[in-house]
């Protein structure tokens, strides 16, 4: 097996404007012992050709061309080929700060970590030149045991540090030994990370912020109506409950977190129904909202959660009243802000 330290895995599709910047942000890393797998997932633009051009000049870059199968399949192809001691997954329309790999590898080597977690940036563009940047920092911590990590995981979930792959460095041996792959599903990052977290023993959190997740709201998946979102969120909640059962963690903090996380997703489902791209009639929307907020799980978990902001407290009022009409009005307002005032929406979302 090659002695390369880090395998960078990046699915590529329809990103000809951005993929060069993503690749160069890895080439500009102060840490140089890496290989990159840029997986062209049957893209119809020039993204694959751009990757080929970079690979022709840098032997550390390997391009795989395949038929379109989605980002999960692209990542999985690279997982099978990667030789690195560590795996790093990034998106092809984002970029990383130059010291990211160096700092992550240093932490992993020093503490024999199976998983290194860091902070990140979300850059939300609301015009071609203006953006709102949310900085997600975190206090550094070396978990002394698996149990300590599990009992503290609610705090990391709360800070949105455990959902995505691009703020993490993974042990390659851990991925291989547990035969972990990205499932072929929408929001594949989340179940992949849950499978990693399920039995991970050695976790280190470092305080640096490195990765820039770029969100262009006009093109964002979050501005689209999804008819199955409520069912997906219900499924997600089941995954989280199963994880905590597997861990044997049932303390007050974790119960409150699971309840609040579920209710926050319920609010997101209401926003989805009131999205302007949703073609349901007014009465159909109200009926769907009623179905969502009258769920027995909502009534069970509402008393267990603690709203963390005035914004969230206000959002909960019509749901506690079980008023589909008022919840509809509230969701419509948020959806309008989401599509019409991106800066304000990004700010409000960060305060949930």
Annotate each PLM feature.
Residues 1-27:
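N-proximal low-complexity "stem/linker" segments adjacent to membrane-targeting elements
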Residues 26, 41-42, 55, 69-70, ...:
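Conserved short acidic donor-positioning loop in nucleotide-sugar-dependent glycosyltransferases
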Residues 32, 40-49, 67:
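A conserved acidic beta->alpha catalytic loop
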Residues 67-75, 79, 186:
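A short, glycine-/small-residue-rich helix N-cap motif at loop->alpha-helix starts
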Residues 113, 275-352:
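Membrane-interface aromatic/basic loop that binds lipid-linked glycans or pyrophosphate carriers
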Residues 208-217, 223-252, 268, 272, ...:
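Catalytic core of nucleotide-sugar-dependent glycosyltransferases
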């Amino acid at each position: 097996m090659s002695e390369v330290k880090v395998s960078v895995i990046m699915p590529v599709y329809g990103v000809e404007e951005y993929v060069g910047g993503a690749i160069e942000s890895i080439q500009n890393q102060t840490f140089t012992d890496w290989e990159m797998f840029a997986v062209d997932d049957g893209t119809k633009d020039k993204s694959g050709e751009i990757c080929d051009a970079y690979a022709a000049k840098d032997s550390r870059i390997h391009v795989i061309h395949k038929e379109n199968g989605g980002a999960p399949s692209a990542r999985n192809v690279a997982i099978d080929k990667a030789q690195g001691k560590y795996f790093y997954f990034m998106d092809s329309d984002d970029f990383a700060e130059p010291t990211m790999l160096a700092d992550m590898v240093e932490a992993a080597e020093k503490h024999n970590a199976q998983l290194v977690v860091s902070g990140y940036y979300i850059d939300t563009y609301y015009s071609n030149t203006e953006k709102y940047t949310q900085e997600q920092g975190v206090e550094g911590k070396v978990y002394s045991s698996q149990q300590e990590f599990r009992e503290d995981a609610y705090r990391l979930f709360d800070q949105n540090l455990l959902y995505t792959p691009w703020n993490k460095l993974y042990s390659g041996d851990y991925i291989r030994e547990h035969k972990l792959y990205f499932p072929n599903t929408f929001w594949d990052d989340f179940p992949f990370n849950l499978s990693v977290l399920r039995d991970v023993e050695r976790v280190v959190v470092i305080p640096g912020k490195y990765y820039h997740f770029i969100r262009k709201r006009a093109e964002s998946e979050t501005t689209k109506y999804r008819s199955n979102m409520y069912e997906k969120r219900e499924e997600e909640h089941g995954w989280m409950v199963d994880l905590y059962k597997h861990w044997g963690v049932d303390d007050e903090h974790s119960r409150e977190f699971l309840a609040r996380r579920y209710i926050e997703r319920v609010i997101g489902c209401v926003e989805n129904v009131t999205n302007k791209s949703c073609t349901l009639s007014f009465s159909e929307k109200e009926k769907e909202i009623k179905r969502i907020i009258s769920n027995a799980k909502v009534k069970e978990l509402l008393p267990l959660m603690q709203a963390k902001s005035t914004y969230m407290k206000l959002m909960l009022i019509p749901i506690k009243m079980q008023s589909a009409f008022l919840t509809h009005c509230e969701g419509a307002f948020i959806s309008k802000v989401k599509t019409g005032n991106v800066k304000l929406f990004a700010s409000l979302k960060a305060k949930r």
